[in-house]
Amino acid sequence: MRIKICGITQPDQGRAIATCGATALGFILVPSSPRYVKIEQINAITAAIPDKIDFIGVFADEQPEIIQQIIVKTPLTSVQLHGKESPEYCQRLRQLLPDREIIKALRIKDRESWEKSAIYFNSVDTLLLDAYHPQLLGGTGHTLDWQALASFSPPLPWFLAGGLNPDNISEALTRLHPQGIDVSSGVERSPGDKDLKKVALLLERLQKFRDQ
């Protein structure tokens, strides 16, 4: 199972989280986000991490060419799209970045929201399901309706996000079977400031699910 801790802003925390066993670190490249980091920060954080893990850049409604320019200047291995990007947009980005994983995040409000995920099946590598919030794109602390998602089984890998934390992760993964999880606010003291004790507890409770 892929374990992504998103909203990394500090080199020491990034290094510690990678050492604890996370398989991916997420970096927010949306200027309006309280977890926003610049290219220089990403490079400083990733330079401090000796382990081979995924570095995922999170964008929202950015121009594909701008994303391409940022990817060239960083060690980001994946691009996560968290805005209103269309399948056509995703295909265009894939043409520009053929050797990078493209992840499309879907902000789920109701069953119809995740049923519409089918339009992305042929244009991205991975899906991510996050809880809908009218003002925030992510890191809301809101959970999805796990029971309603029980039948969600797309033909490509997917991440579960939305309000996951050490206290609810076992229940979430007992009900659902994603290929990865994405956690941000659930292991924070404040936006961008990770609580390493919470991260360690999360990873401890994930141990029994890691080989699934």
Curated annotation (Swiss-Prot):
Superkingdom in the source lineage: Bacteria
Record GO terms (molecular function): phosphoribosylanthranilate isomerase activity
InterPro entries associated with the record: Aldolase_TIM, PRAI_dom, RibuloseP-bd_barrel, TrpF_fam
Record keywords: Amino-acid biosynthesis, Aromatic amino acid biosynthesis, Isomerase, Tryptophan biosynthesis
Signal peptide range: none
TM helices/strands, residue ranges: none
Pathway(s) the chain acts in: Amino-acid biosynthesis; L-tryptophan biosynthesis; L-tryptophan from chorismate: step 3/5
Short name of one Pfam family: PRAI
Reactions accelerated catalytically: N-(5-phospho-beta-D-ribosyl)anthranilate = 1-(2-carboxyphenylamino)-1-deoxy-D-ribulose 5-phosphate
UniProt entry tagged with the keyword Isomerase: yes
A biological-process GO annotation: L-tryptophan biosynthetic process
Known EC number: 5.3.1.24
Family: Belongs to the TrpF family.
Protein name: N-(5'-phosphoribosyl)anthranilate isomerase
Organism: Microcystis aeruginosa (strain NIES-843 / IAM M-2473)
